[in-house]
Amino acid sequence: MELSDANLQTLTEYLKKTLDPDPAIRRPAEKFLESVEGNQNYPLLLLTLLEKSQDNVIKVCASVTFKNYIKRNWRIVEDEPNKICEADRVAIKANIVHLMLSSPEQIQKQLSDAISIIGREDFPQKWPDLLTEMVNRFQSGDFHVINGVLRTAHSLFKRYRHEFKSNELWTEIKLVLDAFALPLTNLFKATIELCSTHANDASALRILFSSLILISKLFYSLNFQDLPEFFEDNMETWMNNFHTLLTLDNKLLQTDDEEEAGLLELLKSQICDNAALYAQKYDEEFQRYLPRFVTAIWNLLVTTGQEVKYDLLVSNAIQFLASVCERPHYKNLFEDQNTLTSICEKVIVPNMEFRAADEEAFEDNSEEYIRRDLEGSDIDTRRRAACDLVRGLCKFFEGPVTGIFSGYVNSMLQEYAKNPSVNWKHKDAAIYLVTSLASKAQTQKHGITQANELVNLTEFFVNHILPDLKSANVNEFPVLKADGIKYIMIFRNQVPKEHLLVSIPLLINHLQAESIVVHTYAAHALERLFTMRGPNNATLFTAAEIAPFVEILLTNLFKALTLPGSSENEYIMKAIMRSFSLLQEAIIPYIPTLITQLTQKLLAVSKNPSKPHFNHYMFEAICLSIRITCKANPAAVVNFEEALFLVFTEILQNDVQEFIPYVFQVMSLLLETHKNDIPSSYMALFPHLLQPVLWERTGNIPALVRLLQAFLERGSNTIASAAADKIPGLLGVFQKLIASKANDHQGFYLLNSIIEHMPPESVDQYRKQIFILLFQRLQNSKTTKFIKSFLVFINLYCIKYGALALQEIFDGIQPKMFGMVLEKIIIPEIQKVSGNVEKKICAVGITKLLTECPPMMDTEYTKLWTPLLQSLIGLFELPEDDTIPDEEHFIDIEDTPGYQTAFSQLAFAGKKEHDPVGQMVNNPKIHLAQSLHKLSTACPGRVPSMVSTSLNAEALQYLQGYLQAASVTLL
């Protein structure tokens, strides 16, 4: 694409069309842009439009399109073509900073994001002058430009907050500090002075405070990994100014908005974060500044209102106190009883109150409420911060704090008892306070793992939680119901089993509550209880204990999916899945109804899949239905096929990308349930599974391979006789997979199934070509993962076709190649093979090479016989060699999978690990001893002589042990 006016005009027209609400106009325009984005100059045309277009809407559209283009294409992925040519990359980096800084703020943000995406890949090595260009702009004095630089620097450097320590990271941070720390400090001082100069100019202050917020965020990022020498030397400058800003109050910066935090609140919030970082990580250096910050932040807390706009500030201020109070250095600041009482009364209790805004979220924005309350995304809420402060104080002052709070809890419960319908919020705060007080350590998976022994959790449960849940009206006091259910979830490991068992029917009733939060919590609590483990690692609750409630449990769970707002509620679907898993055959009588409901739900959500977790659990539930029913009655598989195939066909025909991998996995499960040959309905699908377009989506690959393996296991004879013309297509899939470092193991899974199951004559003509492809890949790109898979394959081939066939195919490709493979690959690398089945395949294969391959005994290969035996004994006895060459540490590959598909999206569609050797060999060591005995019978004297002269002493000792265990000797 040339950088011409005509192309700019065309691009403008198509960008305009992408904004059209009519899909008939919008979609073709989007498709056109996708089709041309691979052309040279395409990104430069977008940047030129940004600069030259007079239409602001087109400029914004071009900036968003450019950012998304960079996001999709900038990263260079191994095994894939470079999507942006080098000339375009150079031109983009040369122009983008200047363009970003000279653009209006709306466009500046998009380009700033694009720079940070490029920077993540290219900075510093491939973009060394980026920092210099940015720092030079500080001199401009134009705060529009300066804020653009700061925003970009923030998006570039914020990853330092969560990167793992490494030499590479230190080197980069040092480079950034050398170039950036001094100019940033000077800018900080200059901006503070300008704030004084312009103290009465509201518009100037807004720009300057935006800068101070970004500068404070950069301070946090640059100080996160370690305390840089520069910032230690300049701590006085930073901390004095932070303290001044923390105590500053300028009426011009106050806002009327009760919801949205203003610039002053955002700046103070960030300063609280910065102070907490120093108090936690650099307490020695920060010690002399700390008392001033504690006082300032305390004053801030007792003077700040309850409005939502102050939430972030208050929660960060409380988090600062929480991080300080649990450090031994600062214990003395809190140990006075009056101080503790004051903190409880003035900070903790007021910030645990259930406010009108919380009530509004509970009723009208339940999804967000649940996300915050249940999933721990409440990191910035007042309640969460107050809870953390309680935990922090309990670290050193558990007794006094528990005593103070017990008084508050009792008085709150008394207030509630006086008039429950008016004072229910008092009980809500009491429950929250007890939860905060009792929880010392908590995980998502297990609830509370460590509790405050001074709080009687069971007594509180019986007296104050159970009565609310036993109330006949499930819709009364919904917040308290949700609190009670959450209490069960959190303290499920502390409350005795008999009380939990009493709760189960109550939770089942609450699945019918109108409140989305209440019925969601009820489903989640049931799901968590059903996963609890007893002393012997079996589930704590047995199917027999839940049996009395089976019908009402299943009915209420499926009814809950029909309640307003919960048609795709992931917690309910997860509870359905977990109930199936726990109850097993107890659900069989209900399956016909349940599978109909699941199928209808699947059809409905396939029109517009928008809830990935819900969809996942739905497919898991379908798999469980199939597994449980067909285990009891394999013939029932036909009923499932009748119920599901119509929907599956629609999903495949409409190319519902999110569901296709799931459909293939369920079909694999169904096909594997057939014990004999493949039904014709599956065979009709077989040719379609080989279409290249399906294999282009990496998400499909594991599921497709699994399905093809099922075809090969169940119907290899049918394929060989009725679909022999499809074998080249099958091998074409193998060839594509083997060429990719990310998917080569999937190629081996497919190849192993072909070798194991297909009639030998149907693949004879392709065998040599298969080996040539594997050797080409070995030559071009040898990785540890590939070698492990290759070793399993050649040994499986040896078991299937015989040792001599393996030697002949190697030497048929190139003379003496068999010896090279033994010497360069099998002997040195066999130790790397992992997994019991994989090791067994290799052991049996190598045993065959040692004892059933005549050239190993009487040609130039004989010298490799003992080293091969030694390597096999090493495979049995030495620890696995899990070293990876240095150059492979940074290859982005999955953990090395085993012989069967390690990746299985659906846990309940997973298949048992398949052992192709099976009962043929139970104990590979005994098998080796027996095979050596047989060989020594055929050529007396030779085997003992080779073993005694060349095998090292330790290996010889192990071998004698195998011979003894097998009750055989070498002749």
Swiss-Prot record:
Give this protein's Gene Ontology molecular function annotations: nuclear export signal receptor activity; small GTPase binding
- The main location class comes to cytoplasm
The compartments listed are: Cytoplasm; Nucleus
Q: Which residues form a coiled coil?
A: none
| Pfam families xrefs | CAS_CSE1 (PF03378), Cse1 (PF08506), IBN_N (PF03810)
Domain Importin N-terminal: residue ranges: 29-102
Provide the transmembrane region boundaries.
none
Keywords (alphabetical) are: Acetylation, Cytoplasm, Nucleus, Phosphoprotein, Protein transport, Transport
Q: What family does the Swiss-Prot or TrEMBL record give for this protein?
A: Belongs to the XPO2/CSE1 family.
The molecule here is called Exportin-2
Species, as recorded: Homo sapiens (Human)
At the highest ranks, the source species' classification is:
Eukaryota, Metazoa, Chordata, Craniata, Vertebrata
